[in-house]
């Protein structure tokens, strides 16, 4: 009897595995990025080739609940003088998540994510990366609320780099000279509580973030964000947000962002403004968590000690070609004495040759008050999915 039960269990397991694999989806992508960057008269080559593979196993008939994994390999050659190593090989686990949806009523649902998946704060500029954790979200017509917690110490710092608080004695552990495919990242525990209340065509957003530092610096960061977004008219939207950050409750800094977008058929025109505090009055320098550079200058510039005002236009031609252009003015706000820092522009196009093949060309240039910061970047990007 016991042998028959084992055989039955084995047969059922094989049938279940076969059905699961038959229902599974898979695919991949190849990217080739050829970049020339540096001083206008001495551009240097930066070559980046990547291959990624993904697999998805549905766990429900509607395909809203699923298991998803994505791995990638990148080869990078960087001839710039600022590069510590010319050649880098990078292996990464981009996604490894279980995603589940439960419909609670015709107008409400519950979502649970577990594993490694990307997430971003409300501004999209402070914490925008993957991490290993849990995300629980409840959404209805009257309210949306979520909780989040994760750990960053198992990430590959060659892919996701977090900014250290050097004043607290911690340096980034990303060492580009290493031959390792995978270098463990800085250790933080991000936690978050998010609330969104829709009313008419508007949204009120309230977020609280904490980043518990498990590195030697023990510099814990806490953020509170308040935002409003929605439509002023049928074709005009806005998004206004401000965030206050404290480090170990010993300092206060601010990051504020405003955006207006006008939609006219296939054309979008956007105006934006950004303030990231420096040593301005009672404010300390604002330091985001994820490394992200808004200025195209020769020296990396984070969202800290700057004021940026910009305009951007996007035009879609026959749903095949997207043409875009934008320009920004940057003010140096690292001290109380505000000073003009520079002007930058970006322009390019995305051409969908086929549904699974895209060619992009992008030009970016920064003109600084200090000419040592001047930089030109030219990119040709080929992306293919299969």
Predicted feature residues:
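Sec-dependent signal peptide hydrophobic core
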Residues: 9-13
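Hydrophobic h-region of N-terminal signal peptides that target proteins for export
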Residues: 14-22
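Long, well-ordered mid-to-C-terminal structural blocks that present hydrophobic/aromatic surfaces
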Residues: 250-292
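Surface-exposed coil loops of outer-membrane beta-barrel proteins
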Residues: 33-39, 80-95, 106-226, 281-312
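Short, solvent-exposed loop/turn segments at secondary-structure junctions
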Residues: 74, 119, 276
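Positively charged n-region of N-terminal signal peptides that target proteins for export
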Residues: 1-8
């Amino acid at each position: 009897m016991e042998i028959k039960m084992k055989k039955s269990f084995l047969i059922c397991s094989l049938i279940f595995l076969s059905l699961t694999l038959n229902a599974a989806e898979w695919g991949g992508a190849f990217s080739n990025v050829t970049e020339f960057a540096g001083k206008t008269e001495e551009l240097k080559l930066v070559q980046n080739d990547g291959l990624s593979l993904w697999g998805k196993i549905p766990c429900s008939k509607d395909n809203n609940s699923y298991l998803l994994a994505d791995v990638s390999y990148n080869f990078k050659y960087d001839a710039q003088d600022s590069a510590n190593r010319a050649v880098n090989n990078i292996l990464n686990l981009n996604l490894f998540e279980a995603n589940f949806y439960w419909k609670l009523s015709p107008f409400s649902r519950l979502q649970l994510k577990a594993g490694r998946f990307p997430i971003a704060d409300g501004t999209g500029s402070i914490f925008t990366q993957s991490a290993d954790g849990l995300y629980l979200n409840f959404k209805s017509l009257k309210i949306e609320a979520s909780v989040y917690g994760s750990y960053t110490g198992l990430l590959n710092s060659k892919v996701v780099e977090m900014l250290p608080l050097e004043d607290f004695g911690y340096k980034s552990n990303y060492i580009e000279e290493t031959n390792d495919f995978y270098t463990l990242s800085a250790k933080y525990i991000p936690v978050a509580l998010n609330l969104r209340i829709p009313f008419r065509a508007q949204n009120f957003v309230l977020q609280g973030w904490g980043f518990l530092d498990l590195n030697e610096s023990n510099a814990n960061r806490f953020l509170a964000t308040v935002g409003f977004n929605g439509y002023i008219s049928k074709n005009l939207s806005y998004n206004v947000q401000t965030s206050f950050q404290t480090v170990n409750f010993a300092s206060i800094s601010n990051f504020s962002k405003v955006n207006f977008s006008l939609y006219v058929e296939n054309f979008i025109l956007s105006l934006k403004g950004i303030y990231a505090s420096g040593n301005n009055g009672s404010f300390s320098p604002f330091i985001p968590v994820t490394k992200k550079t808004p200025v195209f200058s020769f020296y990396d510039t984070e969202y800290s000690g700057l004021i940026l005002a910009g305009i951007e236009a996007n035009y879609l031609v026959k749903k095949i070609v997207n043409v875009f252009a934008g320009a920004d003015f940057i003010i140096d706000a690292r001290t109380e004495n505000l000073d003009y820092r520079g002007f930058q522009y970006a322009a390019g196009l995305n051409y969908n040759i086929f549904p699974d093949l895209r060619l992009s060309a992008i030009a970016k240039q920064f003109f600084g008050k200090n000419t040592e910061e001047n930089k030109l970047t030219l990119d040709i990007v080929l992306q293919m999915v299969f």
